[in-house]
Structures are given as C-alpha cells and as structure tokens.
Amino acid sequence: MSAKIKADEISTIIKERIENFDLSVDVEETGKVISVADGVANVYGLKNVMAGEMVEFESGEKGMALNLEESSVGIVILGKTSGITEGSSVKRLKKLLRVPVGDALIGRVVNSLGEPIDAKGPIEATESRFVEEKAKGIMARKSVHEPLQTGIKAIDALVPIGRGQRELIIGDRQTGKTTVAIDTIINQKGQDVICIYVAIGQKQSTVAQVVKKLEEYGAMDYTIVVNAGASDAAALQYLAPYAGVTMGEYFRDNSRHALIIYDDLSKHAVAYREMSLILRRPPGREAYPGDVFYLHSRLLERASKLNDALGAGSLTALPIIETQAGDVSAYIPTNVISITDGQIFLESDLFNSGIRPAINVGLSVSRVGGAAQIKAIKQVSGTLRLDLAQYRELQAFAQFASDLDESSRKQLERGQKMVEVLKQPPYSPLPVENQVVIIFAGAKGYLDDVATANVTKFEAELYPYIEAKYPEIFEQIRTKKVIDKEVEEILHKALKDFKATFAAN
C-alpha cells in the first residue's frame, strides 16, 4: 500500500519553517595590524571602534583602543606583544574595560585587569565595574569629619588625615614614603577599613617584601594588592591605579570605608608619557602630554566621603610622589600638590640625621584633616607645631651663638625632647590614646629633666605602667575622645608617680 502524500501537511510544515527561519548573522568587525612596536599596535579597518574599547588580537592578547585616527587606530597592548605580527587580525569586543570588585578580592594580589597573580587560585567575584568612572559630584559628598588614624604620632598630631581625604606623601627616594603608607595600613586593623595598595612600576622584589610585611602583621586580611611591575607593559602600569580605585569605590558605595595607596604616581606619569609618545601625541613640559594633569585629577577626584543619603561610605587616597633632590616645583609634584588636600613632606636630611619618620613639620600640611581630628589630640598638640618651628629657629641661631639666655635654652631643650617624642620605629603604629599621653607629657614639661637619650626609654616604660596602674586613662581617652578636668587630674597624678619610679631606676 503506497503512502499518501498530504499536500496541506507539507505546505503547513514549509510555512512553519519559513516563519521560524532566522537570518541573524553574527557580524564581527575585524581589522589588520599595520605595525606593532613598544607595546602599541597600529590597526587598519576598525571603522566603528570606540575610544577606550577593548579589542582582541589573534594571539588571544587583549588591547585597548586609545588613538582614533582617520585611517588607523592606535591600540595599547595589555600583555605580551610576542604573538602579534604585522597582518594578524584584530576583532572588536564592543565593551569597555571592567575589573572584578567585592570581598572576594580581599587578601589577594592581582594585576591591573583584576586577574590573580598570587597562585592562590581563581577569584570568585560576583560583580565587576568599569575602570573609568565619573567622580561623584558636589551634592553626593559630605565634608570630611571622621579621623583616619595612621598610628604615626607626627601625622596624627600635626597633619591629621580624615576619611575621604586625599593626602599626598612626597619626598626623595629612600626617605620612608612607603613605610608611612604601610604603617597606615597596619594601623587600620580592627577599624573596619578595607585597604588597597597599588604598586606601579615597582621591582617585583619590593612588592613581595611589602606583601610579606602585611602578612606578618595580619594586614592582608583586609587588604587588596594591585601590582603592575616595572617589567609590565606601560599600558598595565597606566591602568593599575584606576583598577585599584574602582575596587575601592565598591566598598565606599556600600556604606563601608576604604583606604587606597598609589605607590607611586611619578612612575604612573612616566608610563603614561611613554605610551603617549609612542602613540605620537604631542609632548608638552618635561615631554609629558598635555593631559597629564587630567590623568591624575580624574583619578584622585574619585576619593570622597559620601553623604548620609548615599550611605556615608568613604574612600581615602594617599598618593605617593617621588621627587628628585627635593625639587617640589617639578611638573608632576606641583600638579599633584594642587589636586590633593595637603601633603606630608619627607626629607632626606632629616632621615639621614636619624629623625624617622623624616617628616618636615613646617612644610607638611593637611587642609581638611583638622575637622576630623579628635579633640583630645587637638588639645595636646595645639602648640606643638609652633614650638617645633621656634625650636628649628633657635637651633639655627644656637649654632653660631654660644651663650643663650635661660628661657631660650629651656625652649631649645624642650624642642629636642619633642623631636625625640615624635620619632617612631617602622611598622609600630601607636593607638591614639597612647599618642595623647606621651605628647601631653612632653607639652606639660614632664620630660624637661629627662635626658634626651632617655626619652625613648621613658616612652617605652610609660605605656605599660599606665596600663597596669591607671588603665582608666586610656579607656577614658578612647571613649570620651577629649581630655576633661577629671582625665587631666589622673594624667598629672600618673605622670608624677611614673616620674618618681623612672628617676629611681
């Protein structure tokens, strides 16, 4: 029996097929590499590529379109150039650069693209953000009013930093800039502040040392390290701080507090200059491109203290700048000084004479941190800056004049004692209540008859003594944040008692 062909059935099937026929063709826009050198590829054919768009080379390496010219596109290569040759194809990815953000990154060392480089397995981040974000506007912000304690006496007393501030750390090489930053990170333990350390153009051994120090003090539990080493492509060094600040903004926008350190922006500017010159952009002063100010301003403006409606989170930035032979008037240092809310100036002369941290108190300033300083430390350090300035003046005078009158001699001696008080070994940040006690002791003359050489010993023995005999002093300063009459009386009594036992020893 022959099968009957039903014409209507066939026509129904054909109609269905026609209706469901999908003619969507996936069109990929590709280009060809014209030339490649020094981490930059010139590509022909990517007609509709956007500025800052990600592209992928045949070798699998990613790139970023930075120069859009009439006949070609200048693309910086984010990785190795070895597999990229003239004539190899490049395809658009139709997206801008994003990096992973969130708690999954804490405790990890990542590169500028947020990829792990610490051999601890993949990062399970659930969210990513654009690396280039617009800084928050005026209405979204609130003025800086909460302190960010660094644990360094000279800074917390004289150049206080507030949450949401941008404070520059500036000085020659080997003056302890990174140490100040690392101390600040170590001091955030238990303060609920997430720290991000961005290493730009550093030796890998230096970064490894920093990570080791942070692990040693248990600080990696709340720290992310972003590393673009000296051997990495200039494009990766250029992107590193933006990747770091994007990770920090995530915490700020979720009502949390973050601290970011850029170590250092001088090398960042050099990497950008290298990239710009290879892209044949016109050079300006010191051969930096014309937009090098904008390079740093758009980065540092992203640090802020948000208003209560947006969750009151904060992102504090401590950029580092390396000067050449103390020249603060060079192009990049002046740029960054004008962008930030103050600077901590470190001097090699002070460092070499044994005053460490080598902070020049006269040149260092915090433009907004005063509002964030706790009242107790304000009370004890009120006259400190002036005293130290007068001491420096007298010191210069005393070198030539042999006979000083009694009051000048006393002032000179007290100045020496205060300089000793402000000295501090690296990686040993002090709680704010301890700082208040020792500066109070110096300001009220309790160190006047202690030999300068014994000031460090006096300080080292004072804290355990108060902790054992007068624990309420530390407790009250910690909770009240002010030295009232009651606290002052106990403090005087404690210091007198301690002086008696110290003198006996």
From Swiss-Prot:
It is a peripheral membrane protein. PROSITE patterns: ATPASE_ALPHA_BETA. Its EC number is 7.1.2.2. The keyword Membrane applies. The record marks 364 as: Required for activity. Keywords: ATP synthesis, ATP-binding, Cell inner membrane, Cell membrane, CF(1), Hydrogen ion transport, Ion transport, Membrane, Nucleotide-binding, Translocase, Transport. It catalyses: ATP + H2O + 4 H(+)(in) = ADP + phosphate + 5 H(+)(out). Pfam families: ATP-synt_ab, ATP-synt_ab_C, ATP-synt_ab_N. GO terms for cellular component: plasma membrane; proton-transporting ATP synthase complex. HAMAP family: ATP_synth_alpha_bact (MF_01346). Belongs to the ATPase alpha/beta chains family. F-type ATPases have 2 components, CF(1) - the catalytic core - and CF(0) - the membrane proton channel. CF(1) has five subunits: alpha(3), beta(3), gamma(1), delta(1), epsilon(1). CF(0) has three main subunits: a(1), b(2) and c(9-12). The alpha and beta chains form an alternating ring which encloses part of the gamma chain. CF(1) is attached to CF(0) by a central stalk formed by the gamma and epsilon chains, while a peripheral stalk is formed by the delta and b chains. Produces ATP from ADP in the presence of a proton gradient across the membrane. The alpha chain is a regulatory subunit. This is ATP synthase subunit alpha. It comes from Campylobacter concisus (strain 13826).
